[in-house]
Amino acid sequence: MMKINRLFTVIVLTGIIFGQYNPDNHVVTTSMYYMNSVEDGSWTEFFELAEEEFTKMNRADKYLVSLLVLGHRHSGSLNEVVQIAEWKSIADADKSTVGLADMRKKAWPNEEKRKAFNKKYGRYWESKHTDLAVRELVTSRVKRNNKSTTENTVVSVVEWYLKPMSEVEGGTVKEREALFDEFHKKVIMRNDKILSRREMRHYWTGSLGGGTTPYVIVTEFANIVDADAVGINSETIQKSWPDEEKRKAFFAKRNKYIDREHNLGHRDIALHTNWVKLAKR
């Protein structure tokens, strides 16, 4: 399960960071884990063990709100596995980490069986991990996939860029957030091809102030065809704004906040296979 760098605990305890910018938002950590090549192992055995691991530990961890476990597709190396974990606060994330040992005891109350499982499952993993990011999840614009499924899905990770407010003529944070909320409600929530979506902004990762501000969108699709579809929102947009003039006016207003000059507005970070049986939704 996810381990958070102990530095996070130090920061919380010393009071350097007191919380998210918006107390209604959540904290999301992104970490990378590395698989071992097991001579007498198999993918079948690995996934059987992993399903037991995550099913039991996700259930035991009351602080963990959601978890995506993302395998290789078109990003990185075959042995790299990314976990995107959500908590209500960084304090909850720390409690989750501190309590892992007790959770494992509850999940496998028989000590011998627990040790045997840990040994068998643990050989598939290297002992190291890399903490990639700690971000603020905009909870007012989250779309969750609550449907029961055993079929793996596809997850894209894309970084977008906001203009400094000083460069947006007549712009305000209130207006920007209202426009983003409207797009989420009318497009993202109505588009069945977008299974889930998370918008994450600066917390301890990325830039803030002095220029363009990046934010990250994590989107889940049923298949690679939908993930690759450039105009996946076109039909929903047409239905939500049937009047062409009103449609143009809305996007002209919204898009003035997006920095199109920086990497043409976005940068594709990753495309993963989402191992749905390991997720906590």
Explain the meaning of each model-derived region.
Residues 19-108, 112-241, 248-281:
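Short S/T/G/P-rich N-terminal loop/turn motif that feeds into the first structured element of a domain
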Residues 4-16:
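Sec-dependent N-terminal signal peptides
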